């Protein structure tokens, strides 16, 4: 492989391709003469669209094929939405860079209503996220929540076809695809705690590939890394998967990191919340400490009940 070429493995969805093109442009900006090639591919998560993610293996379904491409030296890096990146990496691969975060909030999208509180009793809301379902059900148990899969365009099409009264999507994805005008209202982190890593793009590569790691270095955003590390540490310590509603969101003011987290029943009947504050350089420890507090407040019973089923 030429020293002036870097190959990006990416999913074929419009949002995944946007992320890959973003990384391509950043690499070309920092490294004159570098050729960046895209290797688009379909993953199991893109193909299995008729079953809720929680029932078919979770978000790891979106990254496995990309990782195989790197291990087989068909690609040098893979670009991921951080909220889709599993906790564990295959031997020889690792998360090298976390880019600057986009808007981490959820977005309320509807053609007839301004926000969740305005929805009439029994309105149908579409989302594939148990985290979103849990928090909506906690505040509006009268709403009917139906699973919603597919890429952003497909989901908007289902809303426009009248299958849903409203749908909930990640604000970052709509902004990146220049679909911000479809956002009826933003849902604050106080109203709906985001998923860990939501809005951030991560770059995975072979851990022994020093050439590629040097090329990627300028794309790292330190503050975003601190925030995402804290969020992922909480999730990892809880051993949380796609079957449990878990939210985590970190903010940094000066050098102080504030991490909020929640664990809930899928039906929204019981939500446990906690907050930890500390130095941003202790992000990992803050995440673990918050997980311990959530467990001590009853999250363990929720996790055990879900995983026994």
UniProtKB/Swiss-Prot annotation:
Signal peptide: none annotated. Binds 1 dipyrromethane group covalently. The keyword Lyase does not apply. One of its GO terms (biological process) is protoporphyrinogen IX biosynthetic process. GO terms for cellular component: cytoplasm. Its cofactor is dipyrromethane. It is an enzyme of class 2 (transferase). Pfam families: Porphobil_deam (PF01379), Porphobil_deamC (PF03900). One of its GO terms (molecular function) is hydroxymethylbilane synthase activity. Keywords: Porphyrin biosynthesis, Transferase. It catalyses: 4 porphobilinogen + H2O = hydroxymethylbilane + 4 NH4(+). It comes from the Bacteria. Pathway: Porphyrin-containing compound metabolism; protoporphyrin-IX biosynthesis; coproporphyrinogen-III from 5-aminolevulinate: step 2/4. Its EC number is 2.5.1.61. Gene3D superfamilies: Periplasmic binding protein-like II, Porphobilinogen deaminase, C-terminal domain. The porphobilinogen subunits are added to the dipyrromethane group. Tetrapolymerization of the monopyrrole PBG into the hydroxymethylbilane pre-uroporphyrinogen in several discrete steps. Monomer. This is Porphobilinogen deaminase. It comes from Shewanella sediminis (strain HAW-EB3).
């Amino acid at each position: 492989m030429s020293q002036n070429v870097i190959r990006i493995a990416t999913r074929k969805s419009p949002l995944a391709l946007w992320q890959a093109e973003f990384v391509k442009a950043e690499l070309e900006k920092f490294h004159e003469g570098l050729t960046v090639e895209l290797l688009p591919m379909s993953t199991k998560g893109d193909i299995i669209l008729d079953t809720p993610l929680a029932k078919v293996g979770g978000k790891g379904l979106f990254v496995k094929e990309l990782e195989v491409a790197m291990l087989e030296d068909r690609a040098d890096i893979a670009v991921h939405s951080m909220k889709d990146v599993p906790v564990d990496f295959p031997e020889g691969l690792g998360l090298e860079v976390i880019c600057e975060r986009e808007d981490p909030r959820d977005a309320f999208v509807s053609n007839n209503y301004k926000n969740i509180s305005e929805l009439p009793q029994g309105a149908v809301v579409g989302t594939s996220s148990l985290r979103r379902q849990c928090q909506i059900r906690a505040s509006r148990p009268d709403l009917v929540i139906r699973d919603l899969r597919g890429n952003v365009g497909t989901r908007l099409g289902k809303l426009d076809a009248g299958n849903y009264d409203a749908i909930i999507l990640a604000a970052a994805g709509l902004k990146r695809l220049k679909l911000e005008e479809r956002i009826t209202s933003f849902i604050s982190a106080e109203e709906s705690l985001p998923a860990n890593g939501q809005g951030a793009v991560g770059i995975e590569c072979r851990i022994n590939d020093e050439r590629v790691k040097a090329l990627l270095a300028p794309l790292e955003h330190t503050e975003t890394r601190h925030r995402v590390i804290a969020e992922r540490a909480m999730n990892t310590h809880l051993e949380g998967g796609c079957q449990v509603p878990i939210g985590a969101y970190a903010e940094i003011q000066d050098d102080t990191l504030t991490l909020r987290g929640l664990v809930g029943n899928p039906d929204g009947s019981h939500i446990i919340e906690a907050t930890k504050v500390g130095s941003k350089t202790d992000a990992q420890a803050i995440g673990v400490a918050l997980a311990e507090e959530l467990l001590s407040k009853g999250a363990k019973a929720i996790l055990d009940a879900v995983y026994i089923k």
